[in-house]
């Protein structure tokens, strides 16, 4: 999946967790209550089951990743509210 510059997911969780493999570009990830982290090709990011988070590109660079998650009772993700511009810029 590729995120164009400035694009990001909404806040969300995964019932069995999620692994991101960053393959190109430069991105940002944030766990609820944590700092925004920058990610680069070769980085592997793990989000624990139920951990609220978002991920996307930086403001100026696209980011591509492979996302791996499993389903629990037919559901792989629980989408929540959009990430505000203020949250994204932190």
PLM features per residue range, with description:
Residues 1-14, 49:
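Conserved short histidine dyad/triad with adjacent acidic residue
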Residues 9-14, 31, 37-38, 56-57:
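Short histidine-centered beta-strand/loop micro-motifs
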Residues 15-28, 32-33:
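Glycine- and acidic-residue-biased ligand/ion/polar-headgroup-sensing regions
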Residues 33-50:
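Short acidic-glycine-tyrosine-enriched beta hairpin
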Residues 54-90:
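Double-stranded beta-helix
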């Amino acid at each position: 999946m590729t995120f164009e510059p400035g694009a990001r997911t909404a806040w969300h969780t995964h019932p069995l967790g999620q692994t991101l493999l960053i393959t190109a570009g430069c991105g940002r990830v944030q766990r609820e209550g944590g700092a925004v982290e920058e990610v680069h090709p070769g980085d592997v990011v793990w989000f624990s089951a139920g951990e609220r988070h978002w991920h996307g590109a930086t403001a100026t660079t696209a980011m591509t990743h492979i996302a791996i998650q499993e389903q629990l009772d037919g559901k792989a993700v629980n989408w929540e509210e959009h990430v505000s511009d203020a949250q994204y810029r932190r």
